[in-house]
């Protein structure tokens, strides 16, 4: 189940191969004068699909960020996927962020719920309930943690590689959202948020909250 953490995400390999197939002959025939726009596109795609290895934040009972991005929501609300009141923390991913999604906790995958939907701006609150999304409900040492991949205005492809019954490790790569979007995290009300709206976070490196009894 563990992903080998390549420098370039596997989701980007087909794009790089296609651009390379076009760029190399153009460069060979016309030189850099003709091929430089294609090389710029190649470099942009290379940067876009980067997938660096991450070292988990140190400490006990930590809920790690599942994505790179910016905190847009920290609030108590209803978790519609686990039917409970919960602490919700949302990470907005723009097109320049790393797009891999990683587990926030160690735990057992109890449910995976997919919902087709719209593609409104993922920075808006209504994106959580109206957009295409994929919810993963995890039992983390008796605590329910819900991770929701949400598609956005540009991101229209949610990828999830895990199944019900899989065991995840905190920081383990479990999905990908092409071209950025949003990940909502729902935690028990006993969780203490460690981030605020506007904070910049990094998947696995940043702790979103502390949940007593998690470890």
From Swiss-Prot:
Keywords: Cell membrane, Decarboxylase, Lipid biosynthesis, Lipid metabolism, Lyase, Membrane, Phospholipid biosynthesis, Phospholipid metabolism, Pyruvate, Zymogen
Reactions catalysed, as given in the entry: a 1,2-diacyl-sn-glycero-3-phospho-L-serine + H(+) = a 1,2-diacyl-sn-glycero-3-phosphoethanolamine + CO2
Co-factor binding comment: Binds 1 pyruvoyl group covalently per subunit.
GO MF annotation: an example: phosphatidylserine decarboxylase activity
Origin superkingdom: Bacteria
Pathway field: Phospholipid metabolism; phosphatidylethanolamine biosynthesis; phosphatidylethanolamine from CDP-diacylglycerol: step 2/2
Functional note: Catalyzes the formation of phosphatidylethanolamine (PtdEtn) from phosphatidylserine (PtdSer).
Name of this chain's protein: Phosphatidylserine decarboxylase proenzyme
Organism this protein belongs to: Polynucleobacter asymbioticus (strain DSM 18221 / CIP 109841 / QLW-P1DMWA-1) (Polynucleobacter necessarius subsp. asymbioticus)
